[in-house]
Amino acid sequence: MKCVVFTGGGTGGHIFPGLAVAEALSSSLECRIVWIGSAKGVDRKIVESSELYSASPSVLEFIGIPAGKLRRYFSFQNFIDVFKVAAGFIKSFFILLKLKPVFVFSKGGFVSVPPCAAAKFLKIPVITHECDFSPGLATRINSKFANRILVSYQETAELLPASLRSKVICTGNPVRLSFYSGRPEKGRSFLNIKSNLPVLFVLGGSLGARQLNDLISDSIEYLVKHFVVVHQIGEANMDQGQKIKEGLLKSSPEFAENYKPYPFIKKEMADVLSLSSIVVSRAGANTVWESAAAGKPMILVPLEKGSSRGDQIENAEFFKKKGSAEILLGEDVRPDIFIRLLRDLGFEENISGNERLKNMAQASAALAGEKPALVIADFLKSFFTSKNEDL
């Protein structure tokens, strides 16, 4: 059985899209998939808790390597991490030498650089994919080793050096195929919803998002009268969710059942998304593309540049420009502005006939309609039959 290598990690954002591609590839082609990630951190846990690993542990294997962080600023830790990167390269070199994979597919993150560099040294084809609107540092480095650079947005090509643009293919951002076929009735059963109110799904991420959680907390008295609020609040913030619930039981007990906090929703995510009338979330690449795959209107609250490199703002602006999202940013992240936006979107009226929401939903579905996981898997399959230089 031929082997392929996937690499990426540091956060789930660099792993979940790769797993979506791995699932699509393995469903149509018999191959062994080895994921090279960080020996420490969340990488192994995410890969080994995936549906693909659970269903076929003989198909998907995880190997950890030393990983040094790539920083854009001065830090004494950079000197230590140089040695970690070097150790990661050496280990990757011998892993690839032994496996002789057909290709190395990178989803970014600092851990992906050593395997891509080692693959280039061994003349193994490298394909890298960027989820965000602007390429991260790891992608910028890996692009120099890559045979092909896959991007989620056509405009991303213009942000790469001119010498690399001929390698770029726009595929969209891969998400699991289940997001295209979520079942609302299963979502309703999982959430135990008996109300006919629209569902407002708040995605704070697996770790939560304090600004977003506080916005919901400060708006909750209004929200529960007009929505069933499904709040993925993060494991570390469940105490806040309980306080919100307890406050409602005292102030508005007849509406308290309309607030449903969860630490993290995993297997049921596609079904809950399909039930939702609108998604309120950060603007990380995976979240916005999963919501788009489900064809949902979005209110995006991106991380500001002080807390990130600005990629979430760029993602949010792209989806707003395409008509699928509205944005709350900076001083606009306030309960009064949030509530006014929901009213402007028509949620106090009959939403079934609301043209604005329908247009936003259609715009979302159109963006993710090509099923990028399948597009990328089909492209990767070409490496099994074509000469490397032809790709």
UniProtKB/Swiss-Prot annotation:
Q: In its keyword annotation, does this UniProt entry include Zinc?
A: no
Localization, UniProt: Cell inner membrane
EC assignment: the record states 2.4.1.227
Any GO molecular function: undecaprenyldiphospho-muramoylpentapeptide beta-N-acetylglucosaminyltransferase activity
UniProt pathway: Cell wall biogenesis; peptidoglycan biosynthesis
Instruction: Tell me which domain of life the UniProt entry assigns to the organism this sequence originates from.
Output: Bacteria
Q: Where does UDP-N-acetyl-alpha-D-glucosamine bind?
A: 11-13, 176, 206, 312
Per the record, membrane topology reads: Peripheral membrane protein
**Which family does the similarity line name?**
Belongs to the glycosyltransferase 28 family. MurG subfamily.
Q: Which HAMAP family match?
A: MurG
Q: What is this protein called?
A: UDP-N-acetylglucosamine--N-acetylmuramyl-(pentapeptide) pyrophosphoryl-undecaprenol N-acetylglucosamine transferase
Give the originating organism. Treponema denticola (strain ATCC 35405 / DSM 14222 / CIP 103919 / JCM 8153 / KCTC 15104)
